[in-house]
């Protein structure tokens, strides 16, 4: 695992970016995050969780000036992001911890929207804010998302429109309650259920975000099949 040196300043916000083979988008995502929080006067620490990418993602991350936590092998999203989250856990165990943001590496320039999640948390609207995409980008027939929505309802009674959105912000106190994240694509369902069961309030904020869509292609359907398998496993693990 590689990690660049952390900021010497205590951050107001810590952003953990999940990435796998995102060399073409990760620099734009990091730059958008840094610029957006700087405009709000926030000291931000950006940590990229690289799930052992086979392209130049790790190199691009360091060139962009973010910290890098690289998985020693491909662990899946939940496992790789857990490694990065453990790097920042000491910060959230201190008094007045920073807000923690989670996002995907393929947001590119639309990552400038994420401070609105932090604002929702700071305003006391919720303890865990989940971004709901205001426009649909690609995707399949909604089977995997529908299952995820129903699983969360069954496990903790919440009704979410964006149950597997990876764009989230949380009070620092929430992070220890949801780490380690559920394996692979079960990460977001597990996080939501664990936070709700720990007594934290989960809310949604509509944002105008875009990401790399898989679409109704063979590759897309295989991807959603893997997602659905992980969704079933995370539901079974939390019954």
PLM region spans:
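Hydrophobic helical membrane-anchoring modules
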Residues: 1-11, 180-239
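Alpha-helix termini
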Residues: 35-41, 88-97
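Short, well-formed alpha-helical segments that are part of the catalytic scaffolds
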Residues: 22-37
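Short beta-strand/loop segment that forms part of the nucleotide-sugar
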Residues: 17, 41-52, 69-71
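Conserved donor nucleotide-binding strand/loop of the catalytic core
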Residues: 47, 58-87, 91-94
């Amino acid at each position: 695992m590689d990690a660049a040196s952390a900021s010497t300043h205590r951050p107001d916000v810590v952003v953990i970016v999940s990435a796998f083979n995102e060399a073409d988008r990760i620099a734009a995502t990091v730059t958008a995050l840094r610029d957006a929080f700087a405009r709000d006067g926030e000291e931000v620490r950006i940590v990229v969780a690289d799930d052992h990418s086979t392209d130049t993602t790790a190199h691009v991350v360091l060139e962009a000036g973010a910290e890098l936590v690289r998985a020693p092998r491909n662990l899946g999203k939940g496992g790789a992001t857990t490694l990065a989250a453990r790097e920042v856990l000491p910060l959230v165990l201190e008094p007045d911890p920073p807000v923690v943001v989670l996002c995907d590496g393929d947001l590119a320039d639309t990552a400038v929207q994420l401070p609105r999640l932090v604002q929702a948390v700071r305003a006391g609207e919720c303890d865990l804010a989940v971004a709901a995409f205001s426009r649909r980008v690609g995707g399949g027939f909604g089977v995997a998302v529908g299952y995820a929505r129903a699983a969360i309802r069954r496990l903790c009674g919440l009704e979410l429109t964006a149950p597997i959105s990876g764009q989230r912000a949380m009070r620092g106190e929430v992070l220890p309650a949801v780490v380690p994240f559920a394996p692979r694509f079960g990460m977001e369902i597990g996080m939501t259920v664990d936070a709700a069961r720990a007594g934290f309030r989960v809310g949604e904020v509509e944002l105008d975000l875009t990401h790399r869509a898989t679409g109704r292609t063979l590759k897309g359907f295989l991807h959603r099949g893997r997602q659905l398998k992980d969704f079933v496993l995370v539901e079974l693990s939390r019954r």
